[in-house]
Regions:
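A short beta-turn/loop motif at secondary-structure boundaries
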Residues: 57-61
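C-terminal substrate-binding/catalytic lobe of Rossmann-fold NAD(P)-dependent oxidoreductases
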Residues: 64-115
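Predominantly a Rossmann-like dinucleotide-binding segment in NAD(P)-dependent oxidoreductases
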Residues: 1-52
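A general structural signal for well-ordered alpha-helical segments in protein cores
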Residues: 40-41, 117, 142
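An anion-binding loop in the catalytic cleft
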Residues: 98-104, 117-126, 136-137
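Short Pro/Gly-enriched beta-strand edge/turn motifs at strand-loop
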Residues: 46-54, 77-82
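C-terminal helix-rich "cap/oligomerization" subdomain common to oxidoreductases
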Residues: 122-166
Length: 166
């Protein structure tokens, strides 16, 4: 079976309100991986299968980075709410940066998320939402990450992590 190499980068800058709100408190929100990363963790499970191993490289109130070994992929991820973590300047530093590389092929999915929550809520209200069983794998992975101690720059870590650590 093919094992894919995946780099996931999601940087969605937030204003000062974020740290002052419940979202900025890891005890209330579950942290960055739960708040902004759970959807991507879920997507990766749907595509590449269940988790086999997790490694947390970095965890702070504004950033989470780590490695996920899934049945069909090795995933290095970098999640942040800090605009300064963007890999390159942008006309609007507050706009999201969503980037996926699979076996060297780049996918920029920065656009197209405008009404995602609205569509999801409409489907839920129409009785076509997701069941707990549909998300259990992602929630289990998130739980494993939240119970992990950050190991720093060891093993197979996301390249943007060097900017934070060095």
């Amino acid at each position: 079976p093919t094992i894919y190499d995946v780099d996931l980068t999601y940087i969605t800058p937030r204003g000062s309100w974020y740290a002052a709100s419940w979202k900025g408190d890891p005890c209330k929100s579950g942290g960055v991986a739960a708040n902004i990363g759970i959807h991507f963790i879920d997507m990766l499970h749907w595509i590449f299968g269940p988790v086999e191993k997790v490694v947390l490289h970095h965890s702070s109130p504004e950033c989470s980075a780590g490695f996920l070994q899934l049945k069909g992929a090795r995933v290095r991820y970098f999640l942040s709410v800090n605009a300064a973590h963007r890999p390159s300047p942008n006309d609007n530093p507050m706009s999201p940066y969503r980037h996926l590389v699979i076996n060297g092929e780049e996918f920029d999915f920065t656009n197209g998320f405008t009404d995602l929550h609205t569509l999801s809520y409409e489907r839920i209200l129409a009785g076509r939402g997701f069941a707990v069983e549909d998300t259990a794998c992602a929630v289990h992975t998130l739980d494993m990450l939240q119970k992990s101690a950050a190991v720093g720059l060891t093993g197979d870590y996301h390249p943007l992590l060097r900017n934070l650590q060095g």
